[in-house]
Protein backbone atom coordinates (compact mmCIF):
# COMPACT_ATOMS: atom_id res chain seq x y z
CA UNK A 1 0.00 0.00 0.00
CA UNK A 2 1.40 3.41 -0.97
CA UNK A 3 0.52 6.80 0.54
CA UNK A 4 -2.18 7.60 -2.01
CA UNK A 5 -3.82 4.22 -1.45
CA UNK A 6 -3.85 4.83 2.31
CA UNK A 7 -5.47 8.24 1.76
CA UNK A 8 -8.10 6.64 -0.46
CA UNK A 9 -8.87 4.07 2.25
CA UNK A 10 -9.22 6.83 4.86
CA UNK A 11 -11.51 8.74 2.49
CA UNK A 12 -13.67 5.63 2.23
CA UNK A 13 -13.98 5.68 6.04
CA UNK A 14 -15.22 9.32 5.81
CA UNK A 15 -12.22 10.37 7.88
CA UNK A 16 -11.15 14.00 7.62
CA UNK A 17 -7.36 14.35 7.75
CA UNK A 18 -4.54 16.59 6.57
CA UNK A 19 -1.41 15.63 4.62
CA UNK A 20 0.82 15.68 7.72
CA UNK A 21 -1.34 13.15 9.57
CA UNK A 22 -1.62 10.85 6.54
CA UNK A 23 2.14 11.02 5.90
CA UNK A 24 3.11 10.28 9.52
CA UNK A 25 0.68 7.33 9.61
CA UNK A 26 2.04 5.93 6.35
CA UNK A 27 5.73 6.24 7.30
CA UNK A 28 5.16 4.81 10.80
CA UNK A 29 3.36 1.86 9.20
CA UNK A 30 6.16 1.29 6.65
CA UNK A 31 8.91 1.46 9.29
CA UNK A 32 7.00 -0.62 11.84
CA UNK A 33 7.28 2.18 14.39
CA UNK A 34 4.74 2.76 17.18
CA UNK A 35 2.91 6.08 16.83
CA UNK A 36 2.43 8.32 19.88
CA UNK A 37 -0.47 10.76 19.51
CA UNK A 38 -0.92 13.58 22.02
CA UNK A 39 -3.62 16.21 22.32
CA UNK A 40 -6.47 17.37 24.53
CA UNK A 41 -9.28 14.96 25.40
CA UNK A 42 -11.81 14.74 22.59
CA UNK A 43 -9.68 15.83 19.61
CA UNK A 44 -9.98 12.42 17.92
CA UNK A 45 -6.79 10.57 18.91
CA UNK A 46 -8.52 7.22 19.42
CA UNK A 47 -10.33 7.62 16.12
CA UNK A 48 -6.98 7.45 14.29
CA UNK A 49 -6.43 3.87 15.46
CA UNK A 50 -10.00 2.88 14.56
CA UNK A 51 -9.66 4.35 11.07
CA UNK A 52 -6.29 2.64 10.52
CA UNK A 53 -7.76 -0.72 11.55
CA UNK A 54 -10.60 -0.26 9.06
CA UNK A 55 -8.29 1.06 6.30
CA UNK A 56 -5.85 -1.84 6.71
CA UNK A 57 -8.64 -4.39 7.25
CA UNK A 58 -7.12 -5.42 10.57
CA UNK A 59 -8.61 -6.25 13.95
CA UNK A 60 -8.42 -3.41 16.49
CA UNK A 61 -7.09 -4.59 19.86
CA UNK A 62 -7.53 -1.96 22.56
CA UNK A 63 -5.79 -1.61 25.91
CA UNK A 64 -7.43 1.09 28.02
CA UNK A 65 -4.87 2.36 30.52
CA UNK A 66 -5.66 3.44 34.08
CA UNK A 67 -3.85 4.03 37.36
CA UNK A 68 -2.66 0.72 38.80
CA UNK A 69 -2.74 -1.17 35.48
CA UNK A 70 -0.31 -4.09 35.66
CA UNK A 71 0.94 -6.98 33.53
CA UNK A 72 -1.85 -9.33 34.61
CA UNK A 73 -4.49 -7.03 33.14
CA UNK A 74 -2.47 -5.90 30.11
CA UNK A 75 -0.53 -9.01 29.11
CA UNK A 76 -1.91 -12.27 30.49
CA UNK A 77 -3.25 -14.04 33.53
CA UNK A 78 -3.95 -17.64 34.40
CA UNK A 79 -7.48 -19.01 34.54
CA UNK A 80 -7.29 -19.90 38.23
CA UNK A 81 -10.84 -21.29 38.42
CA UNK A 82 -10.18 -23.69 35.55
CA UNK A 83 -6.81 -24.68 37.06
CA UNK A 84 -8.45 -25.36 40.42
CA UNK A 85 -11.15 -27.47 38.80
CA UNK A 86 -8.51 -29.47 36.95
CA UNK A 87 -6.59 -30.08 40.19
CA UNK A 88 -9.77 -31.33 41.88
CA UNK A 89 -10.59 -33.67 38.98
CA UNK A 90 -7.03 -35.03 38.92
CA UNK A 91 -6.51 -35.32 42.68
CA UNK A 92 -5.35 -38.92 42.33
CA UNK A 93 -3.08 -38.38 39.31
CA UNK A 94 0.16 -40.35 39.63
CA UNK A 95 2.33 -37.92 37.65
CA UNK A 96 2.16 -34.71 39.66
CA UNK A 97 4.87 -33.06 37.57
CA UNK A 98 2.94 -33.62 34.34
CA UNK A 99 -0.20 -32.23 35.99
CA UNK A 100 1.68 -29.10 37.08
CA UNK A 101 3.08 -28.64 33.56
CA UNK A 102 -0.37 -29.02 32.01
CA UNK A 103 -1.82 -26.42 34.39
CA UNK A 104 0.49 -23.81 32.86
CA UNK A 105 -0.28 -24.58 29.23
CA UNK A 106 -2.16 -22.59 26.61
CA UNK A 107 -5.41 -24.16 27.73
CA UNK A 108 -5.33 -22.13 30.95
CA UNK A 109 -3.73 -18.95 29.62
CA UNK A 110 -6.00 -15.91 29.34
CA UNK A 111 -4.66 -13.52 26.71
CA UNK A 112 -4.95 -9.85 27.51
CA UNK A 113 -4.59 -7.15 24.79
CA UNK A 114 -0.76 -7.01 24.60
CA UNK A 115 -0.27 -10.77 24.36
CA UNK A 116 -3.22 -11.14 22.00
CA UNK A 117 -1.75 -8.55 19.63
CA UNK A 118 1.65 -10.24 19.28
CA UNK A 119 0.31 -13.81 19.16
CA UNK A 120 -2.19 -13.02 16.44
CA UNK A 121 -1.41 -14.82 13.17
CA UNK A 122 -2.59 -11.76 11.24
CA UNK A 123 -1.19 -8.30 12.08
CA UNK A 124 -3.55 -6.19 14.19
CA UNK A 125 -3.78 -2.52 15.13
CA UNK A 126 -2.93 -2.25 18.84
CA UNK A 127 -4.38 0.84 20.53
CA UNK A 128 -2.79 1.66 23.89
CA UNK A 129 -5.23 4.33 25.00
CA UNK A 130 -4.33 7.06 27.51
CA UNK A 131 -0.86 5.71 28.37
CA UNK A 132 -0.38 8.79 30.59
CA UNK A 133 -2.89 7.31 33.08
CA UNK A 134 -0.70 4.24 33.70
CA UNK A 135 2.33 4.56 36.00
CA UNK A 136 6.01 4.77 35.02
CA UNK A 137 6.68 1.13 35.95
CA UNK A 138 4.08 -0.06 33.44
CA UNK A 139 5.49 2.32 30.84
CA UNK A 140 8.96 0.76 31.30
CA UNK A 141 7.49 -2.74 30.88
CA UNK A 142 5.66 -1.59 27.75
CA UNK A 143 8.84 -0.11 26.31
CA UNK A 144 10.56 -3.51 26.55
CA UNK A 145 7.67 -5.20 24.75
CA UNK A 146 7.62 -2.57 21.98
CA UNK A 147 11.40 -2.78 21.51
CA UNK A 148 11.75 -6.56 21.45
CA UNK A 149 8.29 -7.60 20.19
CA UNK A 150 8.54 -10.54 22.55
CA UNK A 151 7.53 -11.26 26.11
CA UNK A 152 8.64 -13.73 28.76
CA UNK A 153 6.07 -15.60 30.83
CA UNK A 154 7.87 -17.37 33.72
CA UNK A 155 5.86 -20.61 33.49
CA UNK A 156 5.94 -20.76 29.68
CA UNK A 157 9.12 -19.06 28.48
CA UNK A 158 9.66 -16.40 25.83
CA UNK A 159 6.85 -15.77 23.37
CA UNK A 160 7.96 -14.02 20.19
CA UNK A 161 5.59 -12.07 17.98
CA UNK A 162 3.85 -14.07 15.24
CA UNK A 163 3.16 -10.74 13.53
CA UNK A 164 4.10 -7.13 14.23
CA UNK A 165 1.10 -5.00 15.23
CA UNK A 166 0.73 -1.38 14.17
CA UNK A 167 0.85 0.29 17.59
CA UNK A 168 -0.93 3.57 18.37
CA UNK A 169 -0.42 5.11 21.81
CA UNK A 170 -2.54 8.07 22.91
CA UNK A 171 -1.89 10.56 25.71
CA UNK A 172 -3.85 13.49 27.14
CA UNK A 173 -0.58 14.67 28.79
CA UNK A 174 -1.83 14.06 32.34
CA UNK A 175 1.81 13.28 33.20
CA UNK A 176 5.07 13.52 31.22
CA UNK A 177 6.03 10.38 29.32
CA UNK A 178 9.62 9.10 29.42
CA UNK A 179 12.13 10.21 26.82
CA UNK A 180 12.87 6.52 26.15
CA UNK A 181 9.26 5.91 25.09
CA UNK A 182 9.20 9.06 22.97
CA UNK A 183 12.42 8.02 21.19
CA UNK A 184 10.87 4.68 20.30
CA UNK A 185 7.80 6.26 18.66
CA UNK A 186 6.85 8.44 15.73
CA UNK A 187 4.97 11.48 17.08
CA UNK A 188 1.82 13.37 16.20
CA UNK A 189 0.06 16.20 18.04
CA UNK A 190 -3.61 16.74 17.24
CA UNK A 191 -5.29 20.08 17.89
CA UNK A 192 -9.01 20.72 18.07
CA UNK A 193 -10.24 21.13 14.48
CA UNK A 194 -10.67 24.61 13.06
CA UNK A 195 -14.04 25.78 11.72
CA UNK A 196 -13.46 24.37 8.21
CA UNK A 197 -12.32 20.94 9.40
CA UNK A 198 -15.11 20.66 11.99
CA UNK A 199 -17.70 21.50 9.34
CA UNK A 200 -16.14 18.91 7.01
CA UNK A 201 -16.38 16.29 9.80
CA UNK A 202 -20.04 17.16 10.40
CA UNK A 203 -20.82 16.86 6.68
CA UNK A 204 -18.94 13.56 6.37
CA UNK A 205 -20.43 11.91 9.46
CA UNK A 206 -23.95 13.43 9.30
CA UNK A 207 -24.67 13.93 5.59
CA UNK A 208 -28.45 14.05 6.21
CA UNK A 209 -28.24 17.06 8.55
CA UNK A 210 -29.08 20.47 7.09
CA UNK A 211 -25.89 22.15 5.86
CA UNK A 212 -26.74 25.54 7.34
CA UNK A 213 -27.36 23.96 10.75
CA UNK A 214 -24.01 22.13 10.52
CA UNK A 215 -22.28 25.47 9.86
CA UNK A 216 -24.04 27.08 12.85
CA UNK A 217 -23.12 24.16 15.13
CA UNK A 218 -19.48 24.22 13.98
CA UNK A 219 -19.23 27.96 14.63
CA UNK A 220 -20.95 27.67 18.02
CA UNK A 221 -18.56 24.92 19.12
CA UNK A 222 -15.55 26.99 18.00
CA UNK A 223 -16.81 29.86 20.15
CA UNK A 224 -17.47 27.60 23.14
CA UNK A 225 -13.94 26.19 22.94
CA UNK A 226 -12.39 29.64 22.77
CA UNK A 227 -14.46 30.83 25.76
CA UNK A 228 -12.07 30.79 28.73
CA UNK A 229 -14.97 30.40 31.19
CA UNK A 230 -15.90 26.98 29.74
CA UNK A 231 -14.04 24.33 31.77
CA UNK A 232 -14.63 21.25 29.58
CA UNK A 233 -14.07 22.05 25.93
CA UNK A 234 -16.52 20.20 23.66
CA UNK A 235 -15.05 17.16 21.90
CA UNK A 236 -15.61 16.29 18.24
CA UNK A 237 -17.93 13.47 19.36
CA UNK A 238 -19.99 16.00 21.33
CA UNK A 239 -20.20 18.28 18.30
CA UNK A 240 -21.62 15.35 16.33
CA UNK A 241 -24.01 14.42 19.15
CA UNK A 242 -25.26 18.00 19.36
CA UNK A 243 -25.91 18.31 15.63
CA UNK A 244 -27.68 14.91 15.64
CA UNK A 245 -29.83 15.98 18.62
CA UNK A 246 -30.86 19.22 16.92
CA UNK A 247 -31.67 17.31 13.74
CA UNK A 248 -33.71 14.71 15.68
CA UNK A 249 -35.83 17.57 17.06
CA UNK A 250 -36.39 18.91 13.55
CA UNK A 251 -34.46 22.09 14.40
CA UNK A 252 -32.97 23.88 11.39
CA UNK A 253 -31.81 27.08 13.10
CA UNK A 254 -29.59 27.33 16.18
CA UNK A 255 -31.68 29.89 18.08
CA UNK A 256 -31.09 30.72 21.77
CA UNK A 257 -34.08 28.52 22.63
CA UNK A 258 -32.68 25.57 20.64
CA UNK A 259 -29.29 26.14 22.24
CA UNK A 260 -30.79 26.11 25.74
CA UNK A 261 -32.83 22.93 25.12
CA UNK A 262 -29.94 20.92 23.69
CA UNK A 263 -26.92 22.33 25.56
CA UNK A 264 -26.64 19.08 27.55
CA UNK A 265 -25.32 17.33 24.44
CA UNK A 266 -22.32 19.65 24.14
CA UNK A 267 -21.69 20.93 27.70
CA UNK A 268 -21.27 18.29 30.37
CA UNK A 269 -21.14 20.02 33.73
CA UNK A 270 -23.26 22.48 35.70
CA UNK A 271 -20.62 25.23 35.78
CA UNK A 272 -20.38 25.29 31.99
CA UNK A 273 -24.18 25.31 31.64
CA UNK A 274 -24.32 28.28 34.04
CA UNK A 275 -21.59 30.07 32.07
CA UNK A 276 -23.59 29.55 28.88
CA UNK A 277 -26.71 31.00 30.53
CA UNK A 278 -24.74 34.02 31.70
CA UNK A 279 -23.42 34.55 28.18
CA UNK A 280 -26.94 34.27 26.77
CA UNK A 281 -28.27 36.84 29.23
CA UNK A 282 -25.86 39.32 27.70
CA UNK A 283 -26.81 38.27 24.18
CA UNK A 284 -25.62 34.96 22.78
CA UNK A 285 -23.15 35.20 19.94
CA UNK A 286 -22.97 31.49 19.11
CA UNK A 287 -23.70 30.15 15.65
CA UNK A 288 -27.22 31.03 14.62
CA UNK A 289 -27.85 33.17 17.67
CA UNK A 290 -26.44 36.42 16.29
CA UNK A 291 -28.72 39.33 16.87
CA UNK A 292 -30.91 37.52 19.41
CA UNK A 293 -31.07 39.18 22.82
CA UNK A 294 -33.31 38.23 25.66
CA UNK A 295 -33.47 38.92 29.35
Regions found by a protein language model. Give the residues of each.
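C-terminal regulatory/interaction module of P-loop NTP-utilizing enzymes
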Residues: 1-295
